[in-house]
Amino acid sequence: MMNDLGLYVHIPFCQARCHYCDFVSLCPRPGDIDNYLGALEKELLGFDRLFDRSIIETIYIGGGTPSILNLDQTGRLLEMLQPLRKAVTEFTIEANPESVSDEKVRLWQDHGIDRVSLGMQTSDPLWLKTLGRIHTTEKVAQAVDIIRQRIDCLNIDLIYGLAPGDKTYMKTLEEIIGLRPQHISIYELEVYDHLPLAKMLSERVDSDESFEQFHRLMSRLESAGYQRYEVSNFSLPGFEAKHNQRYWKRQNTLGIGLGAHSLIDNKRFNNTADLTQYLAEERIEHRENLSS
C-alpha cells in the first residue's frame, strides 16, 4: 500500500542572520553551499525505499534563505528533486526579497514550483534595520512583481508584537493587502535572550497587547476576504497551504537537511544542527516514538 508523504528540504544559508532568528541558519563560507548540496543529495538517496512506497504530495524548500542559491546551485537542487515530483500537488520555496530575480523565478517555474513564501516581515525601515533584515520595501514590490508573472500562489510573512504601542504592523498589513497575495502568514515576534535583538529592545510587548494586535490583524484580514485556517495562516478561498496542514494533522512528513525534523509512521526524528557533523553524514540527532 502506498502512503502519502510531505517532503521538507532545509537550506540553512542566509546572506545575513536576522537579529531575532532562532532557526537553524548560518552565513555560508566559500564552498559551504556546494558541499551542503552534495550531502543533501546523499541523504535523499538514503530514503529511496521510503520514496518507493510513498506518494509525495507536497514539497517545501525552507530555510534559512533558499533563494540565496545562485542559478547553478538552484538548478542542482531542483534536479535532485525532479524524480520525486510526479504526484506533487503543491511545491513551495521560501524567498527573501533581496535575492529574487527573474532568472531564478523562471528556473523555479520550469521545475514545477507553484508557490513562493516571501519574507517581508515589516514595511517600516527602522524596524527592518532593528530586525536585521537587509531588504527595502522597494525590493518587496519588485520581488512580488517578478514572482507574480510566473508563480500561481504567493504567501507574504508579517511579524507583529514588535514593541509596546507600536502601530507599524497595521501599516505593513495594509501594504500587504494592497499587493493581494493569495496567502498571508502573521507571526508574533519571539525574543530570545541569547540573540542580538534582546539587547536592542528597551521594552517587550506583553501577552494582553499581543492578543489585541493579533485580533486587529485578524479582523482586517477577514474584512479583506482572507480566511483563517490555522493559528497564524490566512488565505483567499482555495489557497490554503497543503504542506502546512500536514504538520497540524500529524501526517507523514520527511525532513531532510541540517536540523530538519521528520514524522514517519508515528516516529519522530531530527537531524543534527551542526554543519560539520551533517557534512560528515552524522545526521540523526534524536528519535522518539509518539503515542497514537
Locate each region found by the language model.
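Short active-site neighborhood of thiol/selenol oxidoreductases, capturing the structured segment around
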Residues: 7-10
